[in-house]
């Protein structure tokens, strides 16, 4: 059942929040096991996060979908690089930003593999859409509301696909 998998994903992603609340003691043993057993910073945890992103998008919660997607992209890229997704998070985000900035320089862009180019475009788009949403359009050249909702929905799906891809699958 998709809703059950999405609830499991929510439990995994929200572990720090869930564990800090007394409600965990009253939660079903099944929910408690989801929180205890899955590591959101693992490939299995990322597959659950991809499901959560899709569920949020399907319910029209595109801001939340984009937020989870952006964080999960950082985690997945850290794992792909063999880095610690928690300890090296800031450095990995900086690297993603550097890749996205490289799109502006033709010489840098020419050195990108197709996979790196797609990742740089995904990160750049996620960052721009997130900024448009979180800054309530108070930016130069913000997207229109209708276009922003469409873009956020499309990006959420692209990010979910990238996050959940197989290890041996290209970016």
Enumerate the language-model features and the residues they cover:
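Long, low-complexity, Lys/Arg-enriched
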Residues: 1-171
């Amino acid at each position: 059942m998709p809703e059950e998998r999405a609830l499991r994903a929510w439990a995994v992603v929200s572990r720090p929040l869930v564990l800090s609340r007394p409600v965990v003691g009253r939660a079903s043993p099944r929910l408690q096991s989801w929180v205890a057993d899955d590591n959101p910073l693992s490939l299995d945890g990322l597959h659950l996060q991809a499901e959560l992103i899709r569920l949020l998008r399907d319910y029209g919660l595109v801001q939340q979908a984009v937020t989870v997607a952006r964080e999960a992209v950082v985690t997945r890229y850290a794992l792909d690089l063999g880095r610690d997704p928690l300890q090296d998070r800031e450095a990995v985000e900086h690297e993603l930003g550097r890749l996205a900035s490289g799109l502006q320089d033709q010489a840098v862009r020419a050195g990108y593999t197709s996979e790196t180019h797609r990742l740089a475009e995904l990160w750049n788009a996620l960052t721009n859409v997130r900024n448009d949403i979180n800054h309530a359009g108070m930016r130069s050249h913000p997207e229109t509301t209708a276009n922003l909702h469409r873009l956020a929905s499309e990006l959420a799906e692209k990010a979910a696909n990238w996050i959940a891809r197989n290890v041996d699958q290209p970016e």
